[in-house]
UniProtKB/Swiss-Prot annotation:
Cited function: May be involved in Ca(2+)-dependent exocytosis of secretory vesicles through Ca(2+) and phospholipid binding to the C2 domain or may serve as Ca(2+) sensors in the process of vesicular trafficking and exocytosis. Regulates the Ca(2+)-dependent secretion of norepinephrine in PC12 cells. Required for export from the endocytic recycling compartment to the cell surface.
Positions contributing to Ca(2+) 2 binding: 138-139, 197, 199, 205
Protein name stated in the entry: Synaptotagmin-5
Vesicular face residues: 1-24
Record's keyword annotation contains Transmembrane: yes
Record: residues binding Ca(2+) 4: 270, 276, 330, 332
Gene3D superfamilies, per database record: C2 domain
GO cellular component, one term: neuron projection
Ligand binding (Ca(2+) 1): 139, 145, 197-199
Tissues of expression: Expressed in kidney, adipose tissue, lung and heart, as well as at higher levels in brain.
Keywords: Calcium, Cytoplasmic vesicle, Endosome, Membrane, Metal-binding, Repeat, Synapse, Transmembrane, Transmembrane helix
Length: 386
């Protein structure tokens, strides 16, 4: 029952290991390797995260710098077009449009200095628009934004226009225009130099004009003269209505947004004296339609309100090669939809369409709204861009 005592000379029994000795012993190698590996991975991950963060900052700064370059390029492009453009013939209003404004007599209109010369070698009449002074103030601020439209009757379509001079009643133009006309035909022509006040949001008011029968001019030597402005006769023409829309271009995203806002005084197309108008918006490139959008139909109205936005992808290097065309049509449930009028904007369009486009480019990311007079559908087709 009791263990036998050890006999002399026999080996002593083994004693159990002491746990305190194990805790004080050496750590196994695999544990150290695991700890070192984990620490290394942690340090590597931290360094990698910091590296990626710095790379993102650099890329962000680079893209921001590129965006600034795009914005500056587009702004300069827009400014280069602004001074080259003037309103279309259809937008000129010979009568003052300010409320309560009376027709000014010739003593209040101002006067114009011009020059005439004929180049017998090239068969060209050279008309110089030098300056004007004492022009009538047609703006609310007591000033005007004058420019001069020059043409030879009976041809009203072949016009030249000076630049618009902002907020002045004494503009200095200093511009010369050439009309290729055989000398034997000049006697039957009448030179018209009409001074207008430019208005972005309405029709342009006629300040006055000078008419010079060419039969009364001796072109054997250059002529320079001052003439008092006369009241311009009102030209009757079919009114198709006006449309207001805004343009917004974001160069960094290559995004063009057209917002069709409203139209007014549209031509009556239905038997009942109204119309069911809607607007088609086309993006053209090289004279060909590449994208098409359209608004909703507004029933029984000549003054529709839309406020509908349409976006097109236009890369920055293509913005000079595209045009936007807006056509107002009358919806007909039973027959063919009939076009009321059309307007186009772009660098190859000219007139108010070019001015609106140039203002959009000069103010990237900002919507630029403007009223446009509708033109007959067969006369508003944009010119293909080069």
């Amino acid at each position: 029952m009791f263990p036998e005592p050890p006999t002399p000379g026999s080996p002593a029994p083994e004693t159990p290991p002491d746990s305190s000795r194990i805790r004080q012993g050496a750590v196994p190698a695999w544990v150290l390797a695991t700890i070192l590996l984990g620490s290394g991975l942690l340090v590597f991950s931290s360094c990698f995260c910091l590296y990626r963060k710095r790379c993102r900052r650099r890329m962000g700064k680079k893209s921001q710098a590129q965006a600034q370059v795009h914005l500056q390029e587009v702004k300069e492009l827009g400014r280069s077009y602004i001074d080259k453009v003037q309103p279309e013939i259809e937008e000129l209003d010979p009568s003052p449009s300010m409320p309560g404004q009376q027709v000014l007599d010739k003593h209040q209109l101002g006067r114009l200095q011009y020059s005439l010369d004929y180049d017998f070698q090239t068969g060209q009449l050279l008309v110089g628009i030098l300056q004007a002074e004492g022009l009538a103030a047609l703006d609310l601020g007591g000033s005007s934004d004058p420019y001069v439209s020059v043409y030879l009757l009976p041809d009203k379509r072949r016009r030249h226009e000076t630049k618009v001079h902002r907020q002045t009643l004494n503009p200095h133009f200093g511009e010369t225009f050439a009309f290729k006309v055989p000398y034997v035909e000049l006697g039957g022509r009448v030179l018209v130099m009409a001074v207008y006040d430019f208005d972005r949001f309405s029709r342009n008011d006629a300040i006055g004009e000078v008419r010079v029968p060419m039969s009364s001019v001796n072109l054997g030597r250059p002529v320079q003269a001052w003439r008092e402005l006369q009241v311009a006769p009102k030209e009757e023409q079919e009114k198709l209505g006006d449309i207001c829309f805004s343009l917004r271009y974001v160069p960094t995203a290559g995004k063009l947004t057209v917002i069709v806002l409203e139209a007014k005084n549209l031509k009556k197309m239905d038997v009942g004296g109204l119309s069911d108008p809607y607007v088609k918006v086309h993006l053209l490139q090289g004279g060909k339609k590449v994208r098409k959008k359209k608004t909703t139909i507004k029933k029984n109205t000549l003054n529709p309100y839309y406020n509908e936005a349409f976006s097109f992808e236009v890369p920055c290097d293509q913005v000079q090669k595209v045009q936007v065309e807006l056509t107002v049509l009358d919806y007909d449930k039973l027959g063919k939809n009939e076009a009321i009028g059309r307007v186009a904007v772009g660098t190859a369009v000219g007139g108010a369409g070019l001015r609106h486009w140039a203002d959009m480019l000069a103010n990237p990311r900002r919507p630029i709204a403007q009223w446009h007079s509708l033109r007959p559908p067969d006369r508003a087709r944009p010119i293909p861009a080069p």
